[in-house]
Amino acid sequence: MNSFPWLTIIVVLPIFAGSSIFFFPHRGNKVIRWYTICICLLELLLTTYAFCYHFQLDDPLVQLEQDYKWINIFDFHWRLGIDGLSIGPVLLTGFITTLATLAAWPVTRDSRLFHFLMLAMYSGQIGSFSSRDLLLFFIMWELELIPVYLLLSMWGGKKRLYSATKFILYTAGGSIFLLIGVSGMGLYGSNEPTLNFETSANQSYPVALEILLYFGFFIAYAVKLPIIPLHTWLPDTHGEAHYSTCMLLAGILLKMGAYGLVRINMELLPHAHSIFSPWLMIVGTIQIIYAASTSLGQRNLKKRIAYSSVSHMGFTILGISSITDTGLNGAILQMISHGFIGAALFFLAGTSYDRIRLVYLDEMGGIAIPMPKIFTLFSSFSMASLALPGMSGFVAELVVFFGIITSEKFFLMPKILITFVTAIGMILTPIYSLSMLRQIFYGYKQFNVPNSHFFDSGPRELFVSICIFLPVIGIGIYPDFVFSLSVDKVEAILSNYFYR
């Protein structure tokens, strides 16, 4: 156990440093922005330093572990730790949150509260990914919801209150099932509650109870991931939220659902996961086709990108349900890859809206000529979204396919059928992506508007876009960097399915 509390500092720094924002002058927007960005950069540097010098890549066990007794009466511990499964999402969270803070530069209304909520959300997300205690995981899961609700309801579009209410109803409803699952797992088989992940991983449950616990956790993660039919909050939320909030939602929030599915359902409840995996694979396949088809019919640009996110998360579900090293590594890579690509697409959609004040695709057109930089960036990330070879999405989807084909859990014909149907979904992806590009950038609608003049991408937008584009290309060319983080932990998780 590392004596220095790296993880505690990393988890609490954003929210505690963010609290001091309220002592800043009310009109000091510039100071508040720079302060928030500096906190995010400091947090990212601390995280990177701790992982580079104190994390062993070839060790599947929990590292940087901290365990402090918090509330004696409940035997509740502040228990944190990092392993190969959580290191990728934690680094992704730091990277995307820093860039989302920079993307929020134009926000001037209630600037202190806005930036505090961004930092509070940062703490909740890091805490969720590094928790080693079920109750602490639940608290961090809930802590992250409140800032999203306020960011959406106060800085959203015309229907922001409707979208915020829908978001909180869905997620709070899912959290009830999460709390039931945590309580059931903690109270079973012991006079005292046992909430430690390590203890729960070695606990055997009756099959019926394990299935009930699995289903409870699954509902909570299905809302976040999201899994159809519990996905309808996502397009509305993305359609109304400020694009910096959308970056956090698409880049990190959806990944929390996938992370929970692996961390708790797959690692702690392996028998139930083995029973549910065929159904999960069917749901993932349907989700890819359904969301891709629905995306094509969306007039709203941000809703089209939101449905594309639902479709891409279907590949993560397929990888998790394959119960193979290859498939699960592919699912983790898809989580990281989509975190970058989804955040970038929402950022570019938001910067385009700032200039032309249009969000409906059939009203756009012809802005490639006055805005060539935005056109180039949007085209590049659309290519990444449709899994162009050489970019991260291609490698992730290809590895997931190999995971399905090599899975010993399924017979040959179902594997061929699932691969064939999923391939149709991959064909639909370029259709809605290229159609979106054509409607926004080609034609003459905006170019022929009298006295129209649009500013192209500035240095801030270019910097944010290039910072996201470099990892997309880097992972596409050398995916082994991401695999090296998770491969040993994935083997340890899957050993439960063969030796337990």
Swiss-Prot record:
EC number: 7.1.1.-
MF GO annotations: NADH dehydrogenase (ubiquinone) activity; ubiquinone binding
A GO CC term attached to the entry: chloroplast thylakoid membrane
Enzyme class: translocase
HAMAP family to which the protein is assigned, alphabetical: NDH1_NuoM
Family: Belongs to the complex I subunit 4 family.
PANTHER family (UniProt xref): NAD(P)H-QUINONE OXIDOREDUCTASE CHAIN 4, CHLOROPLASTIC, NADH-UBIQUINONE OXIDOREDUCTASE CHAIN 4
Record's protein name: NAD(P)H-quinone oxidoreductase chain 4, chloroplastic
Organism name: Nandina domestica
